UniProtKB/Swiss-Prot annotation:
Protein biosynthesis listed as a keyword: yes
Entry annotated with the keyword RNA-binding: no
Residues of the active site: K78 (charge relay system), S158 (charge relay system), S182 (acyl-ester intermediate)
Protein name according to UniProt: Glutamyl-tRNA(Gln) amidotransferase subunit A
Complex and partners: Heterotrimer of A, B and C subunits.
């Protein structure tokens, strides 16, 4: 028998409108799952009272025939999104106890459409990480385990709490953010669907900034349809965000039945990199066959500046982070550590408040922006960024509708397995995803298979600017063709 929490978001939405059960019943079922799953550490802050109050309001609207598109659907919110009156920490000690007096635009859009907030989800501190091991509140544990092993594995990052919560059936969907792969990589690691929309499609207002020219909000969900439903509510123009684009938001769910026959799909040769496991290459080849079978045409393409994307990203992103994080000084909000004078207070607060990875990136950013190195590093990285964007522009000008690549260079790994001695080892997790952020394009990760160890593997689709519809249509084809991945056994219950 299917329990309420095993329903997809689309099924739950339709059943609520059909009055098969109430929003309060659904929220209570979800809260019980969350209580059982504390070992995953997916939530930083649970909000059961708020969730039940919102569910009661949803039931009243449904009874009056005033239901919104997400009426009564329980969601998790990445703790990078400001939520009015609810603690927002960015998983950092420096923001512990901070309660915003305002709501982020994206979460406000979700509440406008009737969604219910279950709580705030864990993440890498200030979204800086690829494994969710850098959170001040402890790492998130993936609900997945390798075959025959009880060893904990990472859910990916930085949106590890979002991905783990969705995969473990703790919520029907979750908000996330993606600066270099932080939606797509954890989605691939946990067998969920994650989309990073085109830069400007979703408002950044009220989301704690990491790298402002790269950050973008997006959803993580169990199915392509669920992600499409969430995207429609999250997206939209916001005059409070100067990078928000004033363009109509399509009905993404309606595009899922759109055929892909005649579409031209590019396969970039530069994504065939040394050291990638054979099972990743095999999955990529299988994805090609699925799209061929659906009537798409496959063409080889070249994105020649791909090899420079990762080093350029790790100059641009820390540079912007060092600027954005300068505002945390202990004066107005969050942690304050006393010092002998005002400068001493600044220094003591920032030293105690920021974790190791955040401090590392602030120092890298300050270095590349310094007078003697600005031209040698930052300016050159921005020039490379332009060349990366031009590579994609040429591919799309030649008639390519979308690009298919692996989502990650491996399946999920264990705690402490990567980056403990050399941080670059961890940064290489973003090798297939950072180009998309550097070019401001939409990218979607869809589950496509499992590794030899029984862990989820994903494929990535990269689209033209503001053409998320094509990505959803293609992802729907892959989702239907791929073997169904059973949810992870509830070892934590």
């Amino acid at each position: 028998m299917t329990t309420l929490t095993d329903l997809t978001l689309a099924e739950a939405r339709d059943a609520l409108l059909n009055k098969d059960f109430s929003a309060v019943e659904l929220v209570k079922a979800q809260l019980a799952e969350i209580e059982q799953a504390r070992a995953l550490n997916a939530f930083i802050k649970e909000t059961p009272e708020k969730a039940l109050a919102m569910a009661e309001a949803s039931d009243a609207r449904i009874a009056r025939g005033e239901a919104g598109p997400l009426e009564g659907v329980p969601l998790g919110i990445k703790d990078l999104y400001c939520t009015e009156g609810v603690e927002t920490t960015a998983a950092s000690h420096i923001l512990e106890g901070f309660k915003p007096a305002y709501e982020s635009t994206v979460s406000a859009n979700l509440w406008r459409d009737g969604a219910v907030m279950l709580g705030k989800l864990n993440l890498d501190e200030f979204a800086m990480g690829s494994s969710n091991e850098t959170s001040y509140f402890g790492p998130v544990v993936s609900p997945w385990r390798r075959k025959g092993s009880d060893a904990r594995i990472v859910p990916g990052g930085s949106s590890g709490g979002s991905a783990a919560a969705v995969a473990a059936r703790l919520c029907f969907g979750a908000t996330a953010t993606d600066t270099g792969g932080s939606i797509r990589q954890p989605a691939a690691f946990t067998g969920t669907v994650g989309i990073k929309p085109t830069y400007g499609r979703c408002s950044r207002w009220g989301i704690v900034a990491f790298a402002s020219s790269l950050d973008q909000a997006g959803p993580i969900a169990r199915t392509v349809r669920d992600a499409a439903i969430l995207m429609r509510s999250m997206a939209g123009h916001d005059p409070k965000d100067t990078t928000s684009v004033d363009a109509p938001v399509p009905d993404y769910e309606a595009t899922l039945s759109r055929g892909v026959k005649g579409m031209k799909i590019g396969i970039p040769k530069e994504y065939r990199i040394e050291g990638v496991p054979a099972e990743i290459d095999a999955l990529w080849g299988q994805g090609v066959e699925w799209l061929k079978d659906a009537g798409a045409t496959i063409v080889d393409i070249s994105l020649p500046h791909t090899r420079y994307a990762l080093p350029a990203y790790y100059i641009v992103a820390p540079a912007e982070a060092s600027s954005n994080l300068a505002r945390y000084d202990g004066v107005r909000y969050g942690l304050r550590v006393p010092g002998k004078d005002i400068v001493g207070m600044y220094e003591a607060t920032r030293a105690a408040g920021f974790g190791k990875e955040v401090r590392r990136r602030i120092m890298i950013g300050a270095y590349v922006l310094s007078a003697g190195y600005y031209d040698a590093y930052y300016v050159r990285a921005q020039k490379i960024r332009t060349l990366i964007k031009q590579d994609f522009d040429r591919a799309y000008a030649d008639g390519v509708d979308a690009i298919l690549t692996p989502a990650t260079p491996s399946a999920a790994f264990g705690f402490g397995e990567k980056g403990s001695g050399d941080p670059v080892e961890m940064y290489l997790n973003d090798v297939f995803t950072v180009t998309v952020n550097m070019a401001g394009l939409p990218g979607l990760a869809v589950p496509a298979g499992v590794s030899a160890e029984g862990l989820p593997l994903g494929l990535q689709l990269i689209g033209r600017p503001f053409d998320e519809e094509t990505l959803f249509a293609l992802a729907s084809v892959i989702e239907k063709a791929a073997p169904k991945i059973a949810p992870p056994p509830k070892w934590w219950a």
